[in-house]
Structure formats: C-alpha cells, structure tokens
Amino acid sequence: AAYLAYNYDFTMLILESLKIIHEEWCKFELIASMGYGPRKYVKGSYLRPHADKPQTHVISSIINIDQDDKHDWPLQIYGYDNEVNEVYLKPGEMFLYEGSKLLHGRTQPYQGTHFVNLFLHYRPNEYHIPKVEVEGAYSYKDLNTETDWIDFSNKNTSERIVGKIF
C-alpha cells in the first residue's frame, strides 16, 4: 500500500526549482509536467515493472525523502542494454531516468515500516506526441501496439534523448 500526501504548491516549487538539474542531465529544454508526493510506502508495498506516460513522464526523477534505516528497497530498472540494474537511494538522494522509455519497478515487497519518495516528471519543450482525430478534435494517440511504440520512439529518439549511464 502507498499513501499520497499531495501538496500542489510544494510539488510545483520543487518541479521548477530542480528543472535546471534535469535539463543539464538530458541536454535539452524541459517543461515541468507533473509531480507526485510525498508518497509513503509501507510494509508489503511493491511496484510492478512499467513504463510511464509518454505524454508527461519523459525525463523523470525520484527523490528519497525518508526511509526505515534497517531496510533497503531497490528500484529495478532495465537499461538500454536490456540488463536489470538495481538502484538504492538514501534520504536526500535523487535518481534521474527516462520514465517513459525504461521499464522500472520495485518487485520485491518492502519489509520496512516506511519509505517516502517524491516523483518529478518533465517533457521536452519541443516534442512530438502522436495524435489522432476523434469526432473533429485531436487527442493523444494511445500507444498500445508495438508499431505505435516504434513510431513514437523513432520520432523522439535522437542523440539528445538517449539514455545516460547511471
């Protein structure tokens, strides 16, 4: 189980304040698109491997705010080499990653009492998002098939959006 203590003003302040760090890391201009947290996980929590929303979660970060000192809880993330990497964060540390491209999760149930993270998400200032016409209006295209993802990836992958080694 996870508990969300959302505070819009706080989250937007952090998103805007840390945007420059994310821009320096990925080497292009970003728009702050979404933030979550603080989110508290408790004993038994887990997170299935997933990729985030490509409309808003292109460049992402996780900031560990607090955790039970006795229990680590690694983030598993698949790199561009399809190898699983485990990332361990301590309070005050931040991990940057491409949330909509790299499969990630926490597959081992958490054994501690609490694990608190803040999640920040950005998208490039200039960014192609597939759209489809629905009853005379345009909406974002769902990326459900392998062809959809290949088309999306081909239009948005370049030297400026490749993965960074962590």
Residue ranges and their predicted role:
Residues 1-26:
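Non-heme Fe(II)/2-oxoglutarate
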Residues 28-37:
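A short coil-to-beta-strand element that immediately follows conserved catalytic motifs
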Residues 43-102, 106, 113-118, 124-138:
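Catalytic core of non-heme Fe(II) oxygenases with the double-stranded beta-helix
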Residues 114-166:
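Double-stranded beta-helix
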